[in-house]
Amino acid sequence: MRVRRRKGAKEHLENNPRYVILKPEEVKGHWQEVFGNDHPIHIEVGSGKGRFITGMAAKNPQINYIGIDIQVSVLSHALDKVLDSQLPNVKLMLADGSSLMHYFADGEIDLLYLNFSDPWPKKRHEKRRLTYKSFLDTYKKILPEKGEIHFKTDNRELFEYSLASFSQYGMILEQVWLDLHASDYENNVMTEYEEKFSQKGQVIYRVEARF
């Protein structure tokens, strides 16, 4: 989804190295040192404007979080939320989901979130979907044995595609929600898009899948 370009976004990121990891390839294998503790590390690929990642970090101070996005303007909005919250357990980085193995060592990440990823509905764009096999190959490397992906979307076609992709890869579908907001799931933290879509009456789908 295209986002309006934000003036000064790049400089905003560069001026806040406490929260934005500008050269993540240089800290590969040393993320615990970045956070200054040995707490588990969870990442969100496609973190958008940061509502989810900051919400999770506030609820779970015993876990470290990294929000990852490929769009400079979007990540700059996430940085605003991080600066407002002053949370010590959240970092941000500008990166593509297909390159994560360059920034994280094998098994360095404990859990991975995918929230409202671009569905790339056209067949010729299938390889761009964040639940395509090549992405799963990458996620498997940086997650531990039996590591988990928590995936959430409002797009039924992408959800069904992702369930099939996970299953064909040999992953276990631990829990599946066909209408998250109508369920008794208590630990949900909404993204900006999730609130917008749910207010329009759209169903939200969620799955927890394990390698």
Curated annotation (Swiss-Prot):
InterPro entries: SAM-dependent_MTases_sf (IPR029063), tRNA_(Gua-N-7)_MeTrfase_Trmb (IPR003358), tRNA_methyltr_TrmB_bact (IPR055361). The active site is at residue 118. S-adenosyl-L-methionine binds at residues 44, 69, 96, 118. It comes from the Bacteria. GO terms for cellular component: tRNA methyltransferase complex. Belongs to the class I-like SAM-binding methyltransferase superfamily. TrmB family. Catalyzes the formation of N(7)-methylguanine at position 46 (m7G46) in tRNA. This is tRNA (guanine-N(7)-)-methyltransferase. It comes from Streptococcus mutans serotype c (strain ATCC 700610 / UA159). The gene is trmB.
